[in-house]
């Protein structure tokens, strides 16, 4: 009888002792020895950022044609560098990626994923192009499949300097509507062409650990105010036209 009472007392003591900690197996600080949740659980939230080149609500692919201001443009190549990608709220900034290359011809570059520790943010920030440190490197400094590697064919060796092509747009243009297309190429490469973009978007993960945001690039807006019929050389220097196009790209983003 005494043994039974002793066993009962031990059981009561054991069950009355609460080991507080994180009891959620989904948390990164889950403690399987805890039997009472103390609200200390910490999580990694999965963010999927998807990019698309658009004509209004239509996502474009290679050889699609857009029409605007009596012009028709067939898009054949579109590459755009993003740098220092981050998300932020009023108190914290969290880095996503140092460099990312969107390539219309490669579906594997249509999105970037990241795990972040904050469960809400209000801004999505990035540079269009590369910072001076990144732009001073060469493909030989990277693995071949790195965004800055040789496989992506975005490095330009010029007579006076070397540079990555921040924005590459190639296609065919019809300015008179008779179906006769001629080549139109923009290769924008210069340190001064870097633009910083901040998109406002309230994202709250709530109880879910996964969230997706869509960032669109409106192709028509890139050509806003540009004389497409003019003869335009490769933009290997700091030209007014190059700045105008980069400014237009800066204004062509929308986050959904």
Q: Which residues make up each language-model segment?
A:
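Primarily marks secretory-pathway-exposed extracellular/lumenal segments that are disulfide-
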Residues: 4-6, 13-43
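N-terminal functional modules and adjacent low-complexity/disordered segments of proteins
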Residues: 7-10, 25, 75, 218
């Amino acid at each position: 009888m005494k043994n039974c009472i002793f066993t009962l007392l031990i059981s009561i003591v054991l069950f009355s002792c609460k080991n507080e900690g994180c009891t959620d197996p989904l948390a990164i600080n889950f403690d399987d020895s805890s039997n009472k949740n103390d609200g200390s659980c910490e999580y990694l939230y999965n963010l999927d950022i998807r990019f698309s080149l658009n004509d209004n609500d239509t996502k474009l692919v290679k050889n699609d044609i857009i029409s605007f201001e009596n012009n028709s443009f067939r898009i054949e190549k579109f590459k755009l560098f993003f740098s220092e990608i981050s998300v932020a709220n009023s108190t914290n900034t969290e880095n996503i990626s140092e460099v990312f290359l969107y390539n219309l011809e490669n579906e594997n570059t249509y999105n970037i994923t990241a795990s972040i520790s904050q469960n809400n943010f209000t801004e999505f920030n990035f540079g269009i192009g590369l910072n001076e440190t990144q732009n001073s490197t060469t493909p030989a400094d990277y693995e071949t499949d790195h965004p800055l590697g040789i496989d992506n064919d975005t490095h330009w060796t010029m007579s006076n300097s070397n540079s990555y092509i921040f924005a590459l747009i190639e296609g065919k243009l019809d300015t008179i509507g008779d179906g006769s297309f001629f080549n139109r190429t923009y290769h924008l490469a210069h340190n001064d062409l870097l633009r910083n973009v901040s998109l406002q978007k309230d994202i709250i993960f709530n109880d879910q650990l996964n969230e997706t945001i869509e960032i669109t690039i409106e192709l028509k807006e890139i050509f806003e105010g540009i004389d497409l019929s003019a003869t335009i050389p490769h933009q290997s220097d700091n030209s007014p036209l190059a700045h105008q196009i980069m400014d237009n790209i800066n204004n062509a983003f929308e986050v959904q």
